[in-house]
C-alpha cells in the first residue's frame, strides 16, 4: 500500500508544494509545529533513512538546508530545526521547522487545524523567497 506521502507526490492527495525536483519534493506540513513547518520527502519510498543511497540522503539534506535558509529570511526564527524521525509514516521525510526554542519541536504541539490564511501566506512567502534565492527546485 502506498504511503500518504506517495499519494501526495502522485497528486492523489492535496499539498501546498514549495519544491519539486527529480529526487524529492517539499510541502507544508498539514499539522505544523510552527508556521512554515515543511516536509522534505524523497520521491522514492523508503521506510528508513539508513536504506537511502548516500547521494539521495545528501540531496535531501541540501534541499532541507535551502528550505531552512528561506525560512530564516521569511519567519526570522532563532533557529531552524531539522528532524528525521520516521515513526508515524513509513516513508522517509525531514521536518524543517522555524523555531524559537526546543519546545517548538515537540509533536504534542502540532496544530491539527491550522488557519488556512496563515498556511497560504506561509507557502506564498516561502515560494517567493526560494525563487529569490534561485533554488533549482523552487516552484
Locate each region found by the language model.
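HIT superfamily nucleotide-processing domains
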Residues: 1-139
